[in-house]
Structures are given as structure tokens and as C-alpha cells.
């Protein structure tokens, strides 16, 4: 999970939501540092291939680089991995490695479908008001997918 998702969720006091959706949530040290501390229940694990991280750093931020490098390592080790990434370039790179991805908005839609939240619209509006970037088109699409009517 990248820091933008964690920060966005924390601004609406929902940083533990991913723990309800996944059996375990792993973040690398760079994401923990960008977030500004630990989150109860999250596992902090550094990627072992620092060369891979440094190569990714040529194109991405520290958090996204460590998330993708760690995702590659875990998936090669046989784990079922889904990366939570919002940055478009990071998403493209993760997909090029064959990794499964979802963004913060997708996480909210899944949470509603699973019965953990009542309204994607209300949470996204709160997140946007606190500085979370979500284009009008993505907002509209999220409301549509969450079956919450037109905006």
C-alpha cells in the first residue's frame, strides 16, 4: 500500500479499513516514514532487493518504489499480492510486472460491497475536502460503481 492511500484514509479516520478487507496488510519502511509512523495491525517489511528499489527510484518516489519491489518479491515467493497504488506511473509499472493493483477509490468500493462502509460518496467527499486528489471523472465513476446514483 502506498502512502497516499494511507494518508487519505487517515484523514477520515479510516486507516484500519484495509485490515478488514485483507488477511494482512504489508507496507515498506518508506511508506511508514511518508505516513509519519506506524499503523496498528500493519506489517512493516522492507524489500530485500535494494538494487531493484534504486532502479524504480529513477521513475518513482521512495514509497511507490518499495511497494512495487516488495510486491514483486512477495509474488515471486508464491504469495497472493494486491498492490494498493494511486500514482498512475506506479500503477503502470506494477502492471508491467503482472501485479494486481487497486487504488484507494477501488478499496472504498470494495469496502462498501463487503458491508464495511455505507457510502463511498460521503467518504470520498470528506477525503477530497481534506486534500485527497480525485478527478471529477473518477469520483463520478466511483459513485456509479458503488451504485449510489448520479452526482
Task: Please place each PLM-identified region on the residue numbering.
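Active-site-proximal, substrate-binding regions of enzyme catalytic domains
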Residues: 3-82, 88, 97-99
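Acidic, PIN/NYN-like endoribonuclease modules and their adjacent C-terminal/linker elements
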Residues: 30-32, 91-151
Amino acid at each position: 500500500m502506498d502512502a497516499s492511500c494511507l494518508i487519505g484514509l487517515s484523514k477520515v479516520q479510516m486507516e484500519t479499513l484495509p485490515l478488514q478487507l485483507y488477511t494482512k496488510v504489508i507496507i515498506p519502511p518508506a511508506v511508514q516514514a511518508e505516513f509519519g509512523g506506524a499503523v496498528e495491525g500493519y506489517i512493516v517489511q522492507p524489500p530485500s532487493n535494494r538494487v531493484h528499489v534504486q532502479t524504480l527510484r529513477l521513475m518513482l518516489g521512495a514509497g511507490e518504489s518499495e511497494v512495487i519491489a516488495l510486491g514483486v518479491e512477495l509474488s515471486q515467493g508464491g504469495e497472493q499480492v494486491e498492490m494498493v497504488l494511486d500514482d498512475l506511473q506506479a500503477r503502470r509499472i506494477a502492471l508491467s510486472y503482472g501485479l494486481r493493483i487497486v487504488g484507494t477509490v477501488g478499496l472504498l468500493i470494495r469496502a462498501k460491497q463487503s458491508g464495511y462502509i455505507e457510502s463511498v460518496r460521503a467518504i470520498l467527499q470528506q477525503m477530497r475536502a481534506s486534500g485527497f486528489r480525485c478527478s471529477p471523472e473518477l469520483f463520478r465513476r466511483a459513485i456509479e460503481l458503488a451504485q449510489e446514483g448520479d452526482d
